[in-house]
């Protein structure tokens, strides 16, 4: 329940979503609770109740993540598996970055995005303006954070090609 019984009638619509299975984090409280109210007064009541529920459930973060890390780092075989997975992930990210930079160079006919291949990590900012980011979303269904930050990992499996094509079209006007 997202609200106490006295506030339940103030909610026009409520929804709870769990993302635990999506991320494989079954005990980490991954999800969202939402409520829509038809007046500001009702919103205030529901918001207060949801804040209380939030405080009761999330005052202290789960500590089992640290326990899992401790077990992995203390066990020679698990530690080796973890290092191998990190190496594979790092190499995958580098490949995606290179492929994306190459495809953007090809489709946009510019070296403007070559820096992407040299970055490290899961995210990069493309240096696109607000209007370009909006055009990617509205015209091509490509969702990019407002400052043009993209998740490199989300462009695996050849998804960098249509993304680069959309960027090229947006830049071409």
Label the model's feature ranges.
Residues 16-18, 22-84:
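Conserved core segment of the aminotransferase class I/II
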Residues 1-8, 12:
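Single conserved hydrophobic/aromatic residue that forms the stacking wall/gate
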Residues 15-16, 144:
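General beta-strand structural signal in soluble alpha/beta enzymes
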Residues 102-106, 128-173:
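PLP-dependent enzyme catalytic core of the Aspartate aminotransferase-like
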Residues 57, 61, 88, 92, ...:
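Catalytic cores of large soluble enzymes that bind and process phosphate-bearing ligands
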Residues 81-139:
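Conserved PLP-binding catalytic core of the aspartate aminotransferase-like
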Residues 63, 115-118, 144:
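A structural signal for short secondary-structure junctions
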């Amino acid at each position: 329940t997202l609200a106490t019984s006295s506030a339940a009638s103030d909610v026009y619509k409520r929804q709870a979503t769990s993302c635990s299975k999506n991320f494989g984090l079954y005990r980490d409280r991954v999800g969202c609770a939402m409520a829509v109210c038809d007046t500001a007064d009702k919103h205030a009541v529901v918001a207060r109740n949801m804040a209380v529920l939030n405080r009761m459930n999330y005052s202290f973060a789960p500590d089992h993540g640290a326990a899992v890390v401790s077990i992995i780092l203390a066990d020679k075989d698990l530690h080796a598996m973890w290092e191998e997975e990190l190496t594979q992930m790092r190499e995958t990210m580098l490949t995606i970055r290179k492929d994306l930079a190459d495809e953007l160079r090809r489709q946009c006919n510019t070296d403007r995005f070559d820096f992407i291949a040299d970055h490290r990590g899961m995210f990069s900012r493309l240096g696109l303006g607000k209007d370009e980011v909006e055009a990617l979303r509205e015209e091509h269904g490509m969702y990019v954070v407002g400052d043009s930050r993209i998740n490199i990992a989300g462009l695996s499996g050849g998804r960098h090609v249509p993304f680069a094509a959309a960027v090229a079209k947006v830049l071409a006007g």
